[in-house]
Amino acid sequence: MDENIKKAEYYYKKGVEVGNKGDVEKALEYFNKAIELNPFYRDAWFNKALALRILGRYEEARECFFRGLAVEKHLTHKKYNSDDEK
């Protein structure tokens, strides 16, 4: 597994952990770091959107939600095409 992907997973999990404890600002920092390391981390995009919504930053939350959907579509398309090649 790529080192950046491992690091992104670490930061994502930390974001979930601190977010569950109520520190939404810190969770947002962790989700941003995870996305910086792996821009295709769908769950990080969705959780970033949730954190932004909680913070009342609705337009940014909407944008992140749609980024997450775009990543999901990309990954599904990529998987579908790789399955066809088998």
Curated annotation (Swiss-Prot):
SMART domains: TPR (SM00028). TPR repeats lie at residues 8-41, 42-75. InterPro entries: TPR-like_helical_dom_sf (IPR011990), TPR_rpt (IPR019734), Ycf3/AcsC/BcsC/TPR_MFPF (IPR051685). PROSITE patterns: TPR, TPR_REGION. Keywords: Repeat, TPR repeat. It comes from the Archaea. Coiled coil: none annotated. SUPFAM superfamilies: TPR-like. This is Uncharacterized protein MJ0572.
